[in-house]
Curated annotation (Swiss-Prot):
A zinc finger (PHD-type) spans 78-127, 142-192, 236-285. E3 ubiquitin-protein ligase which accepts ubiquitin from an E2 ubiquitin-conjugating enzyme in the form of a thioester and then directly transfers the ubiquitin to targeted substrates. Essential in early embryonic development to prevent apoptotic death. PROSITE patterns: EPHD. The gene is G2E3. Ubiquitin ligase activity is mediated by two distinct domains, PHD-type zinc fingers 2 and 3. The use of these distinct domains may allow ubiquitination of different targets by each domain. The HECT domain is catalytically inactive and does not contribute to this activity. It comes from Gallus gallus (Chicken). GO terms for biological process: apoptotic process; protein ubiquitination. Its EC number is 2.3.2.26. This is G2/M phase-specific E3 ubiquitin-protein ligase.
Length: 742
């Protein structure tokens, strides 16, 4: 075919109906204006009713135009078993399996598509799997491509090398590597096996394009290798002639990172005494440190091991040994530079760094839970992504203020009155004033008052008549609320709360969230989504009828129930129950709440939130469908950035702070982690959008700790002993919070 014609408006693919143009997932999307055809390459390759009957230069890659039109017409009669829309051109090749689906839907449902031979496709029930022995270790290991942790579990997202039994990959990492390397360079990253490795990856659905590697197709791809990196990347460069100045055989000679070679430093800037001394950049030290953390296994420490500062951080003491006091634990931790700075590997390297490198640093590795599951880690990544999106939406907020007068004893009505007042604008800065002081914690910043207001408001909405269900809730049908447009107001309040720094809802059911972001017509409910126990029990009776006579008897007994749902129909076969159950579920879970759902969706469109939810479903699912994790010492540690002057003993001060967080988390303190956060920020939890400004810690020559809620800054005293530090912390925090509650 002649040169492709591309349509700027990106029409949908004629096979799957999706407008997405993502070559990595769906193949190249091409539009042929003269034939009025737009196709994803993978949708065409995987379609079950079409073959390449032409030469490579005929039609579309050998697929004749008339054959493509016939396949489109055939698919138009087939409904996708996943999204319930027409155009399902791909069918499972397993015998007796009649499932059909679109290519993008199949990817989401974790189907396997084999890009070889007959281009077979397998549904989520019949897809090929890798066999894992029960004797194998279930401890997570590193993906050899991205170096992140990967669970040793039979999951769609996890693949194991057929040639190296201890080599594991993320499916996504393998797919991107295959697309880049092509059939000539795609091989096992450990042993370089090509044939056996490619055969297994093709069987498991990895697409290996028949092309040369991307780096071989680029002109002068290796040109950069002919140049040596000559730049000092140390935060505080001491060279008066600039970062690019390089004088061989002097202290101003630039030395490159021994691991990556893409970062450099003057010898003097990193206190390197001679050229022979090794040096690694911050990024490489962080990667190696994380790798060593993940590979260590917890075991009891021998007495000799207790003297090793590095081991002390990574291992837990044996339960058979006497428990160390907080002071002795801190002495042990102090010997490990990983506690002080995550990018140092040698105990003395902290002192060799320039002062500016020690002014601000994260202490999160100190408390890192190395047994954290991948699911929790993934959830944290999603919440971080959602936080960044909310910060983008917050840019709409201007400096003009709108005051809300809130009565905590009647939170809903006072909030409703404030949101409906004539001068209320979601883009204005919200200032909250509580009109009743009884049983209320006073806050000295409007941020704290606003956070408390949104917290109380979310609790009220969660437990209101607008929702039904236990912990994971769906919308209910409240005619009076619908008449008063309260569903719209609730959606609007949630949107405003998230963008203005309020807490995450965390109580939505998966079915409700899917209806909001995908549309109710694209969602298939199940029995677990039915909130009414009586309705669920009736549907179960129909679903689990084992004979035609028992099914007909159950239908007769449920005559009024079926009539109310519009599902009365003659039952002539036992197979009729599946369609009946499906229609009942759609009615009671989705159709019944269509009006409240649409009103609620309109409210969520405030400040552009719903649009972002539709674009980033996974990220916002973590906020709407999952409760936030309990506040931990790790989270609190990661939240604060330490700032101090050069003359402060940063090591000892930070050590006291970390030891105190550990004591508080383990219950060895009269205050809680929530008390500490409230003392500094006026908030009892970390909002999804984060804090503005970001919380900081300063070690200053003050007598007692000071919490500056306007700046989210915690000023800590410099003490000689940990006990003195702990006593001052607890006395000040308890006294301050007690005074605010009185």
């Amino acid at each position: 075919m002649s040169e492709n014609n591309f349509d700027i408006q990106s029409p949908p693919c004629v096979l799957c109906g999706w407008t997405d143009n993502c070559p990595e997932k769906y193949g190249e999307k091409r539009t042929y204006v003269e034939y009025n055809l737009t196709l994803h390459n993978y949708c065409l390759l995987m379609s079950s009713g079409i073959w390449q009957r032409g030469e490579e230069n005929e039609g579309v890659d050998g697929f004749l135009i008339e054959d493509i039109r016939k396949e489109v017409n055939r698919a138009a009669r087939l409904m996708c078993n996943i999204c319930r829309k027409k155009g399902a051109s791909i069918g499972c090749v397993a015998p007796k399996c009649k499932r059909s689906y679109h290519f993008p839907c199949g990817l989401q449902k974790e189907c396997v598509f084999q890009f070889m031979e007959d281009f077979r496709s397998y549904c989520w029930e019949h897809k090929p799997v890798q066999i894992f022995s029960d004797k194998e270790s279930r401890e997570p290991s590193q993906c050899t491509i991205c170096l992140d942790l990967v669970e040793h579990l039979p999951l769609y997202s996890v693949l194991r090398s057929p040639c190296c039994k201890n080599t594991w990959f993320h499916r996504e990492c393998l797919q991107y590597q295959a697309l880049s390397a092509g059939i000539f360079f795609f091989r096992c990253a450990v042993c370089n096996n090509k044939d056996k490795f490619q055969k297994e990856m093709l069987r498991m659905g990895i697409h290996i394009p028949e092309k040369d590697a991307s780096w071989e197709l680029e002109d002068n791809a290796y040109q950069d290798l002919l140049q040596c990196y000559q730049h000092c990347d140390i935060r505080r460069c001491l060279c008066k002639n600039g970062r690019d100045y390089n004088k061989p055989d002097s202290k101003w000679e630039i030395k490159r990172c021994q691991s990556c070679g893409s970062r450099g430093t003057h010898l003097a800037c990193s206190s390197i005494k001679s050229w022979e001394q090794n040096w690694e950049c911050v990024e490489c030290r962080s990667i190696f440190a994380k790798g060593k953390y993940s590979k260590r296994k917890k075991h009891s420490l021998a007495p000799s091991e207790k003297m090793d500062g590095t081991t002390c951080l990574l291992e837990e003491p044996s339960p058979k040994l006497p428990r160390q006091s907080p002071g002795s634990q801190r002495n042990c931790l102090l010997q490990s530079p990983k506690i002080i700075c995550q990018n140092n590997l040698s105990p003395c390297s902290l002192l060799e760094l320039p002062t500016s490198n020690r002014v601000a640093m994260s202490l999160s590795p100190l408390m890192s839970n190395r047994n954290c599951s991948l699911r929790k880690k993934h959830l944290r990544m999603q919440r971080k992504e959602a936080s960044n999106i909310l910060k983008e939406l917050k840019q709409q907020i201007n400096t003009k203020t709108t005051r809300l007068n809130i009565n905590t004893e009647n939170i809903w009505n006072s909030a409703l009155k404030g949101f409906r007042q004539r001068n209320f604008r979601p883009t204005n800065t919200i200032e909250v004033k509580f009109t009743n002081c009884k049983n209320r914690v006073k806050t000295d910043s409007f941020t704290g008052s606003k956070h408390l207001f949104f917290h109380l408001l979310m609790l009220h909405i969660q437990n209101s008549s607008l929702f039904e269900g236990s912990s994971a809730k769906n919308l209910s049908v409240d005619p009076q609320a619908l008449k008063e447009n309260l569903y719209f107001e609730a959606g609007k309040m949630i949107a405003v709360s998230l963008v203005h720094g309020g807490p995450s809802p965390g109580f939505f059911s998966k079915i409700l969230f899917d209806c909001l972001v995908y549309g109710p017509e694209n969602v298939k409910p199940n029995l677990d989504d039915v909130a009414d126990a009586g309705v669920a029990q009736t549907i179960k009776k129909i679903k689990y009828s084992e004979s035609l006579s028992s099914l007909q008897s159950t239908v007769r007994d449920c005559y009024d129930f079926l009539a109310a749902a519009g599902c009365l129909r003659p039952i002539t076969s036992l197979r009729d129950k599946d369609m009946l159950v499906n229609d009942l579920l759609i009615h009671h879970v989705i159709k019944r709440i269509i009006s409240p759902l649409e009103s609620f969706r309109q409210g969520l469109k405030t400040l552009g939130l719903l649009e972002k939810m539709e674009m980033h479903q996974d990220a916002f699912s973590s906020l709407f469908c999952h409760k936030p994790e309990n506040l931990s010492a790790e989270a609190l540690c990661d939240l604060f950035t330490i700032h101090s002057s050069p003359d402060v003993n940063k090591v000892g001060a930070a050590d006291f702070w970390m030891g105190y967080l550990q004591d508080v988390e383990s219950g060895e303190s009269v205050v809680t982690l929530q008390d500490i956060l409230f003392f500094v920020t006026g908030c009892s939890s970390i909002p999804p959008i984060g804090f503005d400004p970001e919380p900081t810690i300063k070690f200053l020559p003050v007598h007692y700790p000071i919490g500056n809620r306007l700046l989210n800054c915690l000023e800590l005293p410099i003490t000689r002993t940990y006990e003195n530090f702990k006593n001052k912390m607890e006395f000040t925090i308890r006294s301050t919070l007690r005074g605010e509650r009185e």
